[in-house]
């Protein structure tokens, strides 16, 4: 382990000790905000410090074993020292790798809830139907994670599915698992409307946005145009006699969001503002990426809505993720929400890229 990393870990260990002392202070116990902040910092430090303590113990055992090998003449003790040395050398190597991975830059949004927007793209009715299939897939996956899902806005397709659907998923580390779903999802299958049984290729796009708080994304009221109108059901039929639906336009970016499924105009405005903050954040990130180098440092793919990320081939019961080259011959299970294999492969690829970048920076 290099000296800079070791020094940083020593600082973390001292900081954790100080936090533990502070959390016993009566004044801090009374200050809910400070208490919460310290507990969060403590949680972020505990695991890496625990591994560092294990690492230091293993290093001490190596020193002791070497001392025995240098000075001891008893063959039995020498043999035991050799075993101890081998075991702890392996342990140090493993712990160093674990610690270095834990110290890699973390995505600050990984802990957040998400807003997902699915749109039927190329392929007309079939694209809309597939957008509905993807929504169902994410709903089923959310159930396995004990996450809560809430539809924010939906436009039904004429033949089924959705031309657009926006929904929120709340739970533990949702963004960390679903952020790689952004992009174009391509489906190859025979549409129900196809009389001759020909395979058609259609596309639905997915955008996964972290939920942003008012503090993180500040939107000035004078940058908004807010229009109200009557909420309507399928076919444009009025289902509400009051102007409860809300359309908000963010004037600096031209972003428009609408909400009509809330119980009141106030609810719809809150929902629309939640969607707007996420979309303004997305626009800002895209702007920064456009200004950055062509080779992005932290991405498995670009995350752009237009980037083809996955193909779902129904006739062959096959799904391929093009970013990691992973093919699963169990499309039926994937569409039932079993997407963990893709998620794990993508997380591992992101980790691999971060390690490679870190090594490059250390050269």
Swiss-Prot record:
Keyword list, A-Z: Cytoplasm, Methylation, Protein biosynthesis
Residue ranges that the Swiss-Prot or TrEMBL entry lists as coiled coil: none
Localisation per UniProt entry: Cytoplasm
Keyword presence, Magnesium: no
An example Gene Ontology CC term for this record: cytoplasm
SUPFAM superfamilies registered for this protein in UniProt: Release factor (SSF75620)
InterPro entries: PCRF, Pep_chain_release_fac_I, Pep_chain_release_fac_I_sf, Prokaryotic/Mito_RF, RF-1
Chain positions with N5-methylglutamine modification: 237
Domain of life: Bacteria
Post-translational modification remark: Methylated by PrmC. Methylation increases the termination efficiency of RF1.
A molecular function (GO) term: translation release factor activity, codon specific
Keyword Oxidoreductase belongs to the record: no
Entry-linked PANTHER family: LD18447P
Function: Peptide chain release factor 1 directs the termination of translation in response to the peptide chain termination codons UAG and UAA.
Family: Belongs to the prokaryotic/mitochondrial release factor family.
Protein name (database record): Peptide chain release factor 1
Protein encoded by which gene: prfA
């Amino acid at each position: 382990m290099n000296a800079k990393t070791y020094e940083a870990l020593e600082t973390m260990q001292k900081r954790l000790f100080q936090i533990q002392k502070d959390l016993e202070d009566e004044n801090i116990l009374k200050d809910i905000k400070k208490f919460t902040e310290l507990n969060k910092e403590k949680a972020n430090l505990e695991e890496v410090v625990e591994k560092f303590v294990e690492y230091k113990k293993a290093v001490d055992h190596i020193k002791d074993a070497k001392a025995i090998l240098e000075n001891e003449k008893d063959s039995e003790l020498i043999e035991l020292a050799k075993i101890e040395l081998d075991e702890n050398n392996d342990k140090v190597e493993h712990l160093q790798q674990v610690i270095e991975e834990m110290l890699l830059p973390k995505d600050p949004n990984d802990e957040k809830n998400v807003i997902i927007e699915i749109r039927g793209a190329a392929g007309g009715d079939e694209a809309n139907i597939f957008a509905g299939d993807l929504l169902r897939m994410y709903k089923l996956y959310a159930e396995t994670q004990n996450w809560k899902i809430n539809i924010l806005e939906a436009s039904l397709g004429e033949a089924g599915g959705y031309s657009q659907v926006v929904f929120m998923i709340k739970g533990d580390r949702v963004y960390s698992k679903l952020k790689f779903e952004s992009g174009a999802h391509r489906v190859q299958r025979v549409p129900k409307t196809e009389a001759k049984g020909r395979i058609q290729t259609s596309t639905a796009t997915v955008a996964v946005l972290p939920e942003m708080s008012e503090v993180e994304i500040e939107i000035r009221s004078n940058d908004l145009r807010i229009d109200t109108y009557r909420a309507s059901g399928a076919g444009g039929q009025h289902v509400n006699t009051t102007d409860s639906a809300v359309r908000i336009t963010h004037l600096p970016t031209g972003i428009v969001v609408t909400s009509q499924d809330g119980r009141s105009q106030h609810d719809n405005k809150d929902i629309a503002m939640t969607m707007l903050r996420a979309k303004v954040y997305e626009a800002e990130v895209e702007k920064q990426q456009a200004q950055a180098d062509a080779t992005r440092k932290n991405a498995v793919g670009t995350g752009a809505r237009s980037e083809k990320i996955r193909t779902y081939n129904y006739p062959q019961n096959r799904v391929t993720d093009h970013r990691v080259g992973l093919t699963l011959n169990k499309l039926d299970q994937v569409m039932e929400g079993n997407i963990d294999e893709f998620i794990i492969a993508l997380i591992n690829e992101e980790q691999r890229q971060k390690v490679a970048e870190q090594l490059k920076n250390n050269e």
